[in-house]
Regions:
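Anionic-ligand binding patches
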Residues: 3-6, 13-154
Length: 154
């Protein structure tokens, strides 16, 4: 029998990103939609691993299915700690930014703190898997790239 893992995310693009890879390894990734469950979770952790833990525990406790949850943190080299987006990439000073505001905000960070029109940036992935009441955690850098001071033309 194929192993099943519940992915504690409402983001179907995230599910799609892992689905085929896990299937090839004999693991069927189930989405929240697949099992028709949705829990209102307040992701109020101080960092990505805490947020992933909150999501994983909520869905594992409700279903007792092996559960995987993840959260990403954005880290930008060379900017002050209080300006680090962390888990709030789209939220600045408590306000949710639309796409244009986001581009303007990050472009201005590069103009203020960047060297040669760019800032080194990385995504740090935090993952929690709960199986048979045992918790495993993983944190690693998934992508490294530059933020630049001129938005790309569409």
């Amino acid at each position: 029998k194929m192993k099943e893992i519940l992915f504690a995310t409402g983001n179907t693009a995230k599910v799609d990103r892992f689905y085929e890879k896990l299937l090839k390894n004999g693991i069927l990734l189930k989405s929240l939609k697949d099992i028709n469950i949705n829990i209102d979770i307040e992701e109020n952790g101080k960092n990505a691993i805490e947020n992933a833990m909150i999501k994983a525990k909520a869905y594992y406790d409700a279903t007792k299915i092996t559960t995987m949850a993840m959260d990403d943190t954005m880290y930008i080299d060379g900017i002050p700690e209080e300006k680090q987006p962390g888990v709030f990439v789209r939220r600045v000073n408590g306000k949710r930014l639309n796409d244009k505001e986001m581009i303007d905000y990050y472009t201005n960070l590069v103009k203020t703190y960047g060297k040669d029109g760019k800032l080194n940036t990385k995504w740090i992935l935090s993952m929690v898997i709960i199986k048979d009441d045992k918790i495993s955690t993983y944190t690693g850098i998934t992508n490294e790239y530059y933020l630049v001071d001129k938005p790309a033309k569409k």
